[in-house]
Amino acid sequence: MKKESFGIILPITLLAYFLILMDNSIIFTSSVQIGESLNLTDTSLAWVSNAYTLTFGGFLLLSGRLSDLLGRKRIFQIGLAIFGLSSLVIGLAQNASMMILARAIQGIGSSIIAPTTLALMMDTYTGEMRIKAISYYGATAGIGSSVGLLIGGGLTSFVSWRVGFLINVPLTLLLMYLTHRHVVAKAGHQEKIDYLGSLLSVAG
């Protein structure tokens, strides 16, 4: 009996999810160095995290809904592009405004990636394979946070906190390429977007 293989979809989704978890851990371990290098006040430094948290939470439901309506592949690639570009800006940030704005945009990218990775797995795998894929997804949550602390501390001590974000750029480009090549585009549901509900979910 031939053993089933997860193929390329599982590595794509897990790596994408890992990146957003790792970056949050890097922010946690590198906050002092970020504040010093950009001359941030305590309030500005707090907003480096808060801006991300607000946009991530605010856009999470809308992002999941858009992936249902417009198709997982398209929305996932948009999320990767937003995440990669904002990571580039964060890595090159020279002041508080640039850093906070880029973190807010990165939160939007992460809010797209997080639900879409899980949805892609649910669409791709069934039965026992789906159960295993979800267990790997859950394990990635813990591993991503823990490894992020190690990577963030190491990069901050020996190189620069900026590298932790700049490394996202080639990785998101790789993920976009793999998604383009291997993820099958499926039509979304033919329903109208509830603009009022979407606006309220973002504002809430």
Give the predicted meaning of each segment:
Residues 8-53, 113:
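Extracytoplasmic
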Residues 33-35, 64-65, 69, 154:
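Membrane-interface helix termini in secondary transporters
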Residues 36, 86-91, 106, 179:
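MFS-fold secondary transporters
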Residues 39, 71, 92-98, 126, ...:
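Helix-breaking motifs and short loop linkers at transmembrane-helix boundaries and internal kinks
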Residues 50-64, 114-118:
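Central cavity-lining transmembrane alpha-helices of secondary-active solute carriers
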Residues 58-97:
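Conserved MFS/SLC helix-loop-helix module at the cytosolic interface between two early adjacent transmembrane helices
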Residues 104-139:
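Cytoplasmic helix-loop-helix junction between adjacent transmembrane helices
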Residues 157-204:
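Hydrophobic transmembrane-helix bundles of small-molecule transporters
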